[in-house]
Amino acid sequence: MSTLELHHIGKSYQSVMVLDRIDLHVPPGSRTAIVGPSGSGKTTLLRIIAGFETPDAGKVILQGKAMFDGTTYVPAHKRGIGFVPQDGALFPHFTVAGNIGYGLKGSQRDKERRINELMDMVALDRRLSALWPHEISGGQQQRVALARALAQRPVLMLLDEPFSALDTALRASTRKAVAELLSEANIASILVTHDQTEALSFADQVAVMRAGKLAHVGPPQELYLRPVDEPTATFLGETLMLTAQLGTGLAHCALGQVKVDNPHRRGEARIMLRPEQITLTPLRPEQYNAASCLAKVVAIDFAGFISTLTLQIISSGETIEIKTISREDLHVGLTVGLDIMGQAHIFAE
């Protein structure tokens, strides 16, 4: 049984369709990331799951029980769902301990014991318990918000872009710590984000949302390497898209012959490669004949660790752009050999 099931969820504001027949299953203990651009409907979907809003159509099922089905509506505070908002939303007039323990019942000793357990769980030094929210770092504030959400022992944790306000290094470490914590506690979770890297690294199930619909749902590696369509492919990372002729498990394209992930397709198709699949080797003239594909570097856009290279394929004159790790041995006018690792992905007809 799934922890959460969404069936044909629909939502409109006046005449604008925000969510269009959303179906999603969240397995027990799993981490799901809903990723999409601003305005795609992902936060509205999260609020419907939490019970802050009601859908116009569909069903919300939590651990086999209807939270909403058109006749049944269970309010947010009775769903047993934890919620961590984007800014943490800590109570400024409560200490760290007061925030974590907000809503806990029982004796003062029981509350203190539970607060200490939660601080240990989210790797917060107990000496911070008497401090005010403004006296601790952004990463610590997010851990306090997570501990507060965990205090009620939720069956599902919802995370609404909780790392977006943190700097890059802190965001990565906090994200990893939260993912490990939720896995250890065997709590199913849903992260909403517009950051593709965050979604791919946090989740074991990624749902790409576009214009109120789920375009593709599946394991992160599947979505990255075999996306359902070109918009999903480009949204999840840098791509090289090529038109090719297919036959006998190969694509004949500007890069020569490339292996593909569907040996049965024939005819013209669009194929996709990720930049890390392409290896560039600087060549001397006497090495040209040994290369499967030759290209000339016509422009380099340096951006630190990554550079964007504009290459002209010598055999066809076609120009392509690829991103690669910046290297001192690459310069304008250089002839390079291109080698492809792995298979190109063929988009569905």
From Swiss-Prot:
Record bears the keyword Transcription: no
Alphabetical list of SUPFAM superfamilies matching this protein: MOP-like, P-loop containing nucleoside triphosphate hydrolases
Keywords: ATP-binding, Cell inner membrane, Cell membrane, Ion transport, Iron, Iron transport, Membrane, Nucleotide-binding, Translocase, Transport
Pfam family, one: ABC_tran
Residue ranges constituting the ABC transporter domain according to the UniProt record: 4-236
Reaction equation(s) it catalyzes: Fe(3+)(out) + ATP + H2O = Fe(3+)(in) + ADP + phosphate + H(+)
Topology of this chain in the membrane: Peripheral membrane protein
GO molecular function: ABC-type ferric iron transporter activity; ATP binding; ATP hydrolysis activity
List of residues binding ATP: G36, P37, S38, G39, S40, G41, K42, T43
GO CC terms, sorted: plasma membrane
Localization per record: Cell inner membrane
EC number: 7.2.2.7
Predominant location: membrane
Family membership noted in the UniProt record: Belongs to the ABC transporter superfamily. Fe(3+) ion importer (TC 3.A.1.10) family.
Functional description taken from the UniProt entry: Part of the ABC transporter complex FbpABC involved in Fe(3+) ions import. Responsible for energy coupling to the transport system.
Subunit relationships: The complex is composed of two ATP-binding proteins (FbpC), two transmembrane proteins (FbpB) and a solute-binding protein (FbpA).
UniProt-listed PANTHER family: SPERMIDINE/PUTRESCINE IMPORT ATP-BINDING PROTEIN POTA (PTHR42781), SPERMIDINE_PUTRESCINE IMPORT ATP-BINDING PROTEIN POTA (PTHR42781:SF4)
Designated name of the protein: Fe(3+) ions import ATP-binding protein FbpC
Source organism per UniProt: Yersinia pseudotuberculosis serotype I (strain IP32953)
Taxonomic classification: Bacteria, Pseudomonadati, Pseudomonadota, Gammaproteobacteria, Enterobacterales
